[in-house]
Amino acid sequence: EKNMHKPFIHCFKTAKEYYVYDVNTDKIIQVSFETYNFLENNIWDEKAEREIEKLINEGYLKRTRVEEVKHFATDFLESYLENRMNQLVLQVTQKCNLRCSYCVYSGDYKNRNHSQKEMSWETAKEAVDYLYGHSMSSEDIYISFYGGEPLLMFRLIKEVVEYVKREYCQRTVHFNLTTNGTLFTPEIVQYFIKNNIQIMFSLDGPKEVHDKNRIFAGSNRGSFEKLRDSMKMIYSMDRKYYKKNVSFNTVLDPQNELRTIYEFLDKDRLISKNLSRISVLNDNYTDKQCEFSGEFVEEQEYEYFKCFLSKLKRINEKFVARA
């Protein structure tokens, strides 16, 4: 049973210091050993008494217990759903021209497989209309195209963009797309530039790393060179668009050397100035077990350590991997 007469706190210590987490103020306070010993073990000390009195006067160590945790927006949830939706993700197809080894549709994940399913225009239109009807209080709206490989349905993407421009021209709508980058043509690039569509490329690292997992369907041919050609094409057609609208999603395979990937992302001229989002391959919801090499874990933890040091101003940020 909880002691309702004790302050609502949690005491903890490190190798050298003592702390109190004050729940009601959501703050961590460094205290003396004497105060820690009194609050944790009820061992009285004159020094502790003075320090505790000071903390109480500053608003800490209250006995109030939380009876209900409730988000401040809970009472407005229905209104948000009716008027403040701001994002729509359209899975325009489940088809893909690649067979990435860790894809959720590869057959290794529970309840997911590649299929030939495509979204109809009627479904896409209905979804867009629903978003519009439930976003009247949202200043900006975001529509994302996803797959499979969404560029296999470029025709539908164009239909959606043109419909939104025609019917909802008074709204600020942002379009974005996640792609393996192998199907771009000058026509598609020009259309994306014209409509300011943001592109997120799936890129796992240099050629030998990327091609290990991202191969074309029906072959063992890697997709790096084709993706690279698309990046160069967009950059050559409109550098400002490229710098503003192109980003990268990188999946780290724990069997690869982390340093090689970080150096590639940091130094490549078509990548280093653009935003990269990185995630580590895991075996959640899959029948395959993901194995981590000792070198990968060591390098990853070292980069985390350097990141913390940079936040403490102990080292310059330039020594921390940008990714």
Stretches found by the model and what they are:
Residues 109-110, 150-152, 181-186, 198-220, ...:
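Conserved radical SAM core fold
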Residues 5-21, 25-30, 49-89, 107, ...:
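N-terminal [4Fe-4S]-dependent radical SAM core
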Residues 89-91, 142-146, 176-180, 200-204, ...:
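A cross-family glycoside hydrolase active-site/sugar-binding cleft signature
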Residues 73-190, 194-195:
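Conserved alpha-helical substructure of the radical SAM core
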Residues 208-228, 232-323:
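Radical SAM enzyme [4Fe-4S]-AdoMet core and its adjacent flexible, acidic
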Residues 1-25, 29-44, 290-292, 304-306:
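Auxiliary Fe-S-binding modules of radical SAM enzymes
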Residues 193-199, 270-272:
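Glycine-enriched alpha-helix->loop->beta-strand junction motifs that scaffold or abut catalytic
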Residues 95-102, 202, 223, 227:
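Active-site cores of enzymes that catalyze phosphoryl transfer or operate on phosphate-rich substrates
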